[in-house]
Amino acid sequence: MASGILSQSTWVHAEDSAELAKQALNPVAAMYSLPVQYNWDQKMGPSGGGMRSLTNIQPVLPFTLNDDWNLISRTILPVIDQHGLAPGGAADKSGVGDVTQSFFFSPKKPTDSGWILGAGPAILIPTGSDDLLSSEQWALGPTVVALKQSNGWTRGILANHLWGLDDSPPDEKDKVNSTFLQPFLSFTNSQFTTYGINTESTYNWQSREWSIPINLMVTQLLKIKGQPLTVQAGPRYWIESPDDGPQGWGFRVAVTFLFPR
């Protein structure tokens, strides 16, 4: 399969490819992109026999505000398929989860020390197609990103905090009160292959529990029939999770379509 893909594609060697590779790793790059990310996790539920497939559709839309500032819209639409989380298949569901919508106001130029910054609001929208796939409440809070890119290295952090707006959510759901932290580090070589590590840690202030997967990813920048894109794959390991959450190893594969301006 891999040889078939490579036979229809060429490694990207244009002079602007290094910049394109950097932009693909920048959450607030002024570039249209469409990441589609598939995650598989296991050992969920009271018996540890449950599994979940999570496909995140994550369009990124940049808007120019003036000569100095951009507004970057980042949307995460989760499509969920879960099985075996409860006896008798009571929690077996497939459908859409809640959308997370973030807006980053970002200076067009890095700081004097080379840091790229962005900040703005994050909104949780209760779009879940089933009450088992949704928090059933709106939530709002701040989101920030800071990163630095030099000599092939990209390092930084993306974070947000969401507070539920409903003091009494339906179906006895806990009020949303969670912090998300995503520190990341990667290196891109001369063939525009990126080796990266990150965590996507969430702390639930209501239950006082962490969810912490470590992701190890390899990403390749390609052009297929003139369309620049990245393909990504790698394992993930849950070092901390609620009792009914995923345990042990999982994996991620992703493709991101890039549309340079």
Predicted regions, residues:
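Sec-dependent N-terminal signal peptides
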Residues: 1-2
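Transmembrane beta-barrel domains of Gram-negative outer membranes and organellar outer membranes
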Residues: 14-261
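N-terminal signal peptide c-region/cleavage motif recognized by signal peptidases
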Residues: 7-9
